Swiss-Prot record:
This is UDP-N-acetylglucosamine 1-carboxyvinyltransferase. Pathway: Cell wall biogenesis; peptidoglycan biosynthesis. Keywords: Cell cycle, Cell division, Cell shape, Cell wall biogenesis/degradation, Cytoplasm, Peptidoglycan synthesis, Pyruvate, Transferase. The lineage of its organism: Bacteria, Pseudomonadati, Pseudomonadota, Betaproteobacteria, Burkholderiales. It comes from Ralstonia nicotianae (strain ATCC BAA-1114 / GMI1000) (Ralstonia solanacearum). It holds the Pfam family EPSP_synthase.
Length: 421
């Protein structure tokens, strides 16, 4: 099992190009199932989850290739509209094939999902919405079995109000709705930039969607969609991770290929912490000297502070002047990094969904274990500032969501290298 060996060595300097967003690329790849025509994507990150999704689509009969950051997909000949457990268990986004398969082929069999162990993240909102659109769904032996009602040729439009804001639920129902008969209204829809990117791609394919970027999406179903070419948006969480790394280690780094507008909540908190930020249309320059100030924050749905940045920003508070409260409202069980950060000398106490962080002047290197994707990133940042060497174990979590993180950090002066396991 691979590990990362990191030596804390002071400020970072240079440029980093931000990769495409995994959380946009995966649903967009699933959208290829909606059309028999070819489909080309650019700026796709080179990640394990992308490779897993490609493998899943190929298993269904999709012709798919990846060349660097370009992916081509052709779903003209689907012979197995099924997502088996052995692939779905490693990646929750596999559930996103359910809506497209049901909409285009009228039936689907999808294993209940796996992925990071950071809470239940149920799929009941997906199922409830599809049932309102006329799907008959049963769950047997760990699989979601979905089909159209007897005699129905298509899903039908419906007004769907989800009980909570759900990103993958919005994406699944949106992809189902674009081929449904009639009008579908998605109330309480997720507004994340990745959802907007998917919606913009669907419009290129011929979908009729109003309200893109709002919490109310109105979809007029069409009979067929065409192929498309699309460039995936920048990964705002990767960008935020590098911003926190520079804020912690100090230095002067420019991030390229990322529009600042998708990161407003994180940028506001970084300014509160004392970070100097300058920016243009698709770049952000981050400058930091001295210790950050402790900043309290609360995670919530976009456009508020993202749960996927909670661990990284908590790490910044670990070495800050003062104390701060971190409140996690999206997922239960998302403080698994706390124990590992405390092993490095951090002072964090948790109670329920809140962590009280008191900043310390210095962390000390140690062997730590990654428990999920974003927890892994917080441990890498900790290693950049800790005295001595830090060994981060189980970094397969990191490889699921970060494209060459050690190479990008090395290029700006970090002492970090992968040890093959």
């Amino acid at each position: 099992m691979d590990k990362l060996l990191i030596e804390g060595n002071g400020p970072l300097s240079g440029e980093i190009r931000v990769s495409g967003a995994k959380n946009a690329a995966l649903p967009i790849m699933c959208a290829a199932l909606l059309t028999p025509e070819p489909f080309t994507l650019h700026n796709v990150p080179n990640l394990q989850d992308v490779r897993t999704m490609l493998k899943l689509l190929r298993q269904m009969g999709v012709e798919g290739t990846q060349d660097g950051h370009d992916v081509t997909l052709d779903a003209a000949a689907i012979d197995a509209p099924e997502a088996p457990y052995d692939l779905v268990k490693t990646m929750r986004a596999s559930i996103l094939v359910l809506g497209p398969l049901l909409a285009r082929f009228g039936h689907a069999r999808v294993s209940l999902p796996g992925g990071c162990g950071i809470g239940a993240r149920p799929v009941d909102q997906h199922i409830k919405g599809l049932q309102q659109m006329g799907a008959e769904i049963v769950i047997e032996h760990g699989y979601i079995e979905a089909k159209l009602a007897d005699g129905a040729k298509r899903l039908h439009g419906a007004r769907i109000v989800t009980d909570m804001v759900t990103v993958t639920g919005t994406e699944n129902l949106l992809m189902a709705a674009v081929l449904a008969d009639g009008e579908t209204v998605l109330e309480n829809a997720a507004r994340e930039p990745e959802v907007t990117d998917l919606a913009n791609l669907l419009v290129k394919m011929g979908a009729r969607i109003d309200g893109i970027g709002t919490d109310r999406l109105v979809v007029q179903g069409v009979e067929a969609l065409r192929g498309a070419e699309h460039t995936v948006i920048a990964d705002r969480i990767e960008a935020g991770t590098f911003l926190c790394a520079v804020a912690a280690a100090g230095g002067d780094v420019t991030l390229r290929g990322v529009p600042p507008g998708i990161l407003d909540a994180v940028l506001d908190k970084l300014r509160e912490a004392g970070v100097t930020l300058t920016m243009g249309d698709d770049w952000i320059r981050v400058q930091m000297h001295g210790r950050p100030k402790a900043v309290s924050f609360r995670t919530s749905e976009y456009p508020a502070f993202p749960t996927d940045m909670q661990a990284q920003f908590m790490m910044l508070n670990c070495i800050a002047e003062g104390a701060a409260l971190v409140t996690e409202t999206i997922f239960e069980n998302r403080f698994m990094h706390v124990q590992e950060l405390n092993r490095l000398g951090a002072n964090i106490i948790t109670e329920g969904n809140t962590a009280a962080v008191t900043g310390v002047e210095q962390l000390s290197g140690a062997t730590v274990m990654a428990t999920d994707l974003r927890a892994s990133a917080s441990l890498v940042i900790a290693g950049l500032v800790a005295q001595g060497e830090t060994l981060v174990d189980r970094i397969y979590h990191l490889d699921r969501g970060y494209d060459c993180i050690e190479d990008k950090l090395s290029a700006v002066g970090a002492k970090i290298r992968r040890i093959q396991g």
